Amino acid sequence: MNSVTRALVWIRRIFHCRGFGIQSPTDYRFVRYVINEKWPYYAYDELPNDGDWLKRKLGLLYFRLANDRQPRRVIDKVGVMDFVRAGCRKAERVEDADEVELAVVPIAQDYDRLLNRCGEQSVVVFQDIYKQKALWQSIEHDRRVTVAFDLYYCGIVLFDKKRHPHHYIVNF
């Protein structure tokens, strides 16, 4: 993605910066201090940096997610385990799990099987949601998903049944 396209995406989402418009304190904290955290963490310097800005930006997000949620089992289908382990040392990569704690997967048609194994504390990150918008919208509106965050480059879904369903656009 070139810098002009990046700038256009950012400008289009400018009114969704830093949690503006989010009424839920829990969701606001998640957006402000996990998704859009700008302070350098203790392990940022040790994390891989191959020059790809998007891979690095998403990797730092996965680091912050793991740091926040502290999962023991992670389903990683996109190769970000270095970032996840830096955020949670006890995390181990699994191919499959009875109950999902944290999953980072490419957006795909077979999401139904994955969502069936999600509990109230599960977090699933779908990558490249902008490439398959219709599929992302069907995931957002799935009855099992309670909170969905559209970050353009990826989507994060939560499953806490005590909360009212809500879908957010976040300028990431």
Located regions from the model:
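A short alpha-helical cap/connector motif
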Residues: 1-119, 130-172
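Glycine-centered, small-residue-biased loops immediately flanking beta-strands
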Residues: 122
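Generic beta-sheet signal
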Residues: 126-127
